[in-house]
């Protein structure tokens, strides 16, 4: 139990009438700030506490601790002919007088940038670009930063053909026949777009002026321009954000409303489909999230549906979520991805991990909030069902890791110059979610946990933090439940590799799925002909399954069923009649599906069943998608059964993939 000493400082708000009688200490703790001594955590975890919080980010070459960024202004020009963005960035800086060099030098991150000139308070300044240090780039060193505590830094630059922040597509590579460019800056690629303090620990407000022959979207609110120059697009971001959240795209973009504060942008040929896919749900998601946390702070919430090569499901660029076209399933079955990106408006964008070691604070919280949103709308069993799907994805992710001992821990250690992209996996998402779900459960359920959610996001709004700041806040908020919190095996949850302790999930929406999958595994070993299977199974079996249930069904089949009695040596490749019968009987819901999640799981089942006639279909499909969730495991699957086809397919399509995706697939294939 948490005891004195403590210092009491009154809060600006008192909520005594709404509190149940839980003891004076509880009342006090919820409504005043308690300044507690450190080392309140269990000793085993206290021993891991860093010397300072937030922990220093080792994935930057900048001296960001020596300066505060008061504002950032981007003045950019997009050239499709040169596949380059040029222009300038202007920082309003303040010296913090920390560190041994007392800010005599200013260090910024760059990567494959052509830095042309540097000016401080209008005067030209000397600078050097240090030798490249993989994978962190090249440090930009500016001497004699300024004799003033507050000063303006202007840097002129141009991106190069080695830029990892942008993907350029010529007119032949887009379905609309116009060139296109989009950015992807997370985790450490902002430094390849413009010189910056490329760390999530540094936030600033932004303005941007972007010249392009084609429409532009940006991670901010469009400022109406009264000038006659229609090729210049101006934006403002009033909420401080880190550099990695900047998002820029330019191409043949059209727009349509999808809610009172939301617009969808995409190429004209898919605009109507995108509008239909999103218009029923986006505002509902926003209002539901506001009830769980607090008011949406960013004003507008817009969505850019990107080109096919976009590598992620979505990117939470503030005001302008970047989304994959694989969300367009023509039945609104993938809309929950938008709930995830929307949830980032609080977790990740408003409250941010201080370094990529603590990425779970972004993504674990976001998955938790995403599932709270869909649970509030569709019911608690739906939330638990989504968690079951996530648990399976987590197991698959860890099983496929080349170094699970290192990369399956919740808190990472990237302090040896490891590229954060190399550590990217489902772990921070699903392991992080399961920790928060476990805390919700042991602390008394949603009614007990929701006040902490609001407190946490208000306390760290517009700030960056590490795991220990999260833990300290948790313990401070629940002083009367210290014994419960101490019972958590923090060492296992945060620092041990592998799967976490499994929470209890409601399986109501999964039970029928498991039963049908088990029946197929059982019957595959006994029935001999297609007619036999048609007499036992019917398309009506899955008629009422939603897309997530279909995904779980196919995934459970590849795991040889769910039953405790499932055969250990079962192999679908030994039962080709059963495999083909299943796909034939359920073809309307599975084979003909336009939902990319279902389609991918179908291909996975076909590979497990070694249906060789289907390998080419998977290879062709890999040329139509760019989302790494499908591309990377797709190539691994194909490589496991036909390496020659996998290599030929990658060679054919590699230049259509985003640079990050291309590099990671090369690693996966051992190239």
Curated annotation (Swiss-Prot):
Tell me where it resides.
Cytoplasm; Nucleus
What does the entry list as the binding residues for Zn(2+)?
A: 340, 344, 363
Any one GO MF term held by the record is:
epoxide hydrolase activity
Gene Ontology biological process terms, A to Z: lipid metabolic process; peptide catabolic process; protein catabolic process; proteolysis
Q: Which UniProt keywords apply?
A: Cytoplasm, Hydrolase, Metal-binding, Metalloprotease, Nucleus, Protease, Zinc
Indicate what this protein is called per its UniProt record.
Leucine aminopeptidase 2
Q: Reaction catalysed?
A: an epoxide + H2O = an ethanediol
Q: Which family does it belong to?
A: Belongs to the peptidase M1 family.
Q: Which organism is it from?
A: Saccharomyces cerevisiae (strain ATCC 204508 / S288c)
Q: How is its activity regulated?
A: Inhibited by 3-(4-benzyloxyphenyl)-2-(R)-amino-1-propanethiol (thioamine) and N-hydroxy-N-(2-(S)-amino-3-(4-benzyloxyphenyl)propyl)-5-carboxypen-tanamide (hydroxamic acid). The aminopeptidase activity is stimulated by LTA(4).
What does the record's cofactor remark say about binding? Binds 1 zinc ion per subunit.
The family database entries (InterPro entries) matched by this protein are listed as: Aminopeptidase_N-like_N (IPR045357), Aminopeptidase_N-like_N_sf (IPR042097), ARM-type_fold (IPR016024), LTA4H (IPR012777), LTA4H_cat (IPR049980), M1_LTA-4_hydro/amino_C_sf (IPR038502), M1_LTA4H (IPR034015), Peptidase_M1 (IPR001930)
One protein family per Pfam: Leuk-A4-hydro_C
